[in-house]
Amino acid sequence: MRIDLPQNVNFIIDTLYEHGFEAYAVGGCVRDSLLGRTPQDWDITTSAKHAQVKAIFDHTIDTGIQHGTVTVMLEHVGYEVTTYRIDGEYEDARHPKEVTFTSNLKLDLERRDFTINAMAYNHRAGLVDEFDGIGDLKAHVIRCVGYAHDRFSEDALRMFRAVRFAAQLGFDIEAQTKAAIKELAPALSKVSAERIQVELVKLLTSDHPQMMRDLYELGLTAVFMPEFDVMMQTPQHNKHHMYSVGEHTLHTLEHVRADKILRLTMLLHDVAKPVCITTDEEGQNHFKKHPVVGADMTRKILRRLKFDNRTTDCCFKLVKEHDDRPAITERNVRRAMSRIGTELFPLLFEVKRADTLGQSMYKRAEKLEYIAEYERVYRKILADHQCVSKKEMKINGSDLIKMGVEPGPKLGDILDRLYEQVLDDPSLNEAQKLKELANKIITSLI
């Protein structure tokens, strides 16, 4: 079985061999190559110690000396070169207390998480596959190297990674590996929010985001997002729905493109339904104010998972607006665009369509036509260059100061009033008209 290694990777491997050491491409790059995918990174494992690697290559960076890792720079690209090693006892369900370097490749491969990630390759020895990773690739199976219980006890994040790899590759998780995750799921609480966030985004933006269901069934969401468990357990007795809140959410994830903001929004768009649920006399469920309450919950959840402010703010706005159904007039759409922001606004249509496609067939055609009309008016507003943000106004603070307005709250208040009038009537967005309106406002404030 042959893998065409990049020229620089071959150069590093050959150079190490010329100096008396072994070296192989290893891990995810081998897996992806065998699957016909283009690896994002190329990692190299070697019998050389980090000091020897540094002595051999002219340009290196110390990126993980304590773990035997040196980055070799070739043509402004970095390649991580790591000494064969054996991991010692794990003290925090994430990192080993110490590592021991070895000259035995098999011992290095034994410490790795899954069989599909425990293969090595160079053009001299070919594929080194001690744990039948190639068999599991062909069978589309995620299986731990050795005993799953041991691998997950060493590093609790591996449990999440098992589901994430399954989602990215379209694989199944082997039975014993699944059983070990169910047993050890509470240990995920020892892993930092930042690391969980990375895995969550990779899963959500994969081809199989509905594998959030597996995280739930294996007990992992109970650790980092218990709100999702409640969603899965909340029915929707309502003519607009045919799934529980959680199952509806999983269906909507499949109806938006693999964008982080969109997938996070769909994951959380109905997060408040379980706390907003009411039942009428006919046994129908209602979820009044769930978008507003859900936006606040979304912000708290994303902050808890250490998402950046921009991501959090975008999801907050989209969750808050996802169920808003104003009468479609240019005035209403302009105000919605102003409220949400012109950059984010197009995503709202994707959110609304996905939400609709995850519901029952009741009035589905009408709902989709409403969204289409909403989008048509939005595009007309763009084509007409109508003002939907303060920065697009033909008057600004400097203009008002020249008209004698002192800098301060009064100036901001005048701009706000002018903007409100422009949102109602975009024909007013001309410099002379706005100055005349400003003079009237100034006079009224004297």
Model-assigned labels for residue ranges:
Residues M1-I446:
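Catalytic cores of the polymerase beta-like nucleotidyltransferase superfamily
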